[in-house]
Amino acid sequence: MWNCKDKRCVLLPEKMGHVRCARVADYAAALNRGNMYEVLDVNERNVKIRTEEGRVRWFPHTCFVPAGTPLWYLVDFRIGADVEAEPCVQTEVTVVLQQDESEPVHSETRWCYFVTPQYLRQRFEEQAASNEAILPVQLGLNGMVLPVLSHSSIAQALRYLEMQDQLYICTEPL
């Protein structure tokens, strides 16, 4: 059903069945992460399915994984700094992720960090003031920029990453 090479999976048209939504992309109103969908047709880039509302639509292959593929879900998170204090420009976040459809239940504690544009500006100003070479700030996969740090902005960012099937990739093991 799936032909996977070069870390890219393509659904083979001769073996249609079911796929699982792993990533809602820009289709949050039409797709539900974790749900199974019957494949009605495929082409090189898209999968045709029937949504829960009964509409038949094409969606990118990248939104789906083979049926039975476990997904990671956010169970809990803890913010390392008092982000409600003024001003908080950077903090680490510990997340607990759990993989569904796995027996026994598999969970991992991981971490990531968030900074604000103000934090980056301060770093560059410190470099400029020290007359040292201006070096890039490398955030890595587990570092992210938010306009402001608050409990709600961090929660929203984590949920967004989860819905895009990126939360596991954007965190590091503790």
Q: Which residues make up each language-model segment?
A:
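Mixed-charge, Lys/Arg-rich low-complexity intrinsically disordered regions
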Residues: 2-17
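Short linear motifs in intrinsically disordered
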Residues: 8-11, 35-42, 80-87
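Small, basic N-terminal interaction modules of short regulatory proteins
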Residues: 17, 33-36, 68-70, 81
